[in-house]
């Protein structure tokens, strides 16, 4: 029935999106989704253009609304030297009643994938790459206090540098980062999990037995 609509909006887990995109291109239907763009979208974009349709990734909250707001702010400024973006989705304090002070509002696989994703930032004009373990280290985090929510911890979230060219501020920007906000204690738990290898899919050997 896809050929009977103008656009398909995908809110499915990431593993399904390429199949939906292939169907959208086949049927000549615009494709909108909330996840980060994939490198393969460059080639698929040519197929989409031939069909007269658009592929619009990163149209959610983060990424999405945050980038729209950043673009609007940038257009109102003469020059940008720093760009820092924060996004979050957390349970109310009374519901944060587990060791990670968090509850999944999207997919747990998506949460684990995000916590394995390295971060890329710009600091004093230098590109810095951070491993998943490094982004949860205290020296790479900071606290943010919000009037209605109180204190939260901020850790780096993915590649912030690529957006400088997209937003046309690469020449003037000296520092940039994208951050996720969580209740205090969240990052300390996940740093231990990352350091112990619990987020890796590769099997390890323990006393001669393969464990994954």
Feature names for model-found ranges:
Residues 16-17, 39, 92:
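Short glycine-rich, flexible loops that bind phosphorylated cofactors or substrates
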Residues 34-58:
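Rossmann-fold NAD(P)-binding glycine/threonine-rich loop
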Residues 8-10, 31-34, 55-58, 84:
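Short catalytic-loop micro-motif centered on adjacent basic/acidic residues
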Residues 18-22, 46:
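Alpha-helical segments flanking ligand/cofactor-binding loops in enzyme cores
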Residues 51-95:
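Adenosine-phosphate binding glycine-rich loop
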Residues 76-212:
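C-terminal catalytic/substrate-binding lobe primarily of soluble NAD(P)-dependent oxidoreductases
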Residues 1-17, 32:
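Rossmann-like NAD(P)-binding element
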Residues 13, 22-42:
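ADP-ribose/adenylate-binding Rossmann-like module
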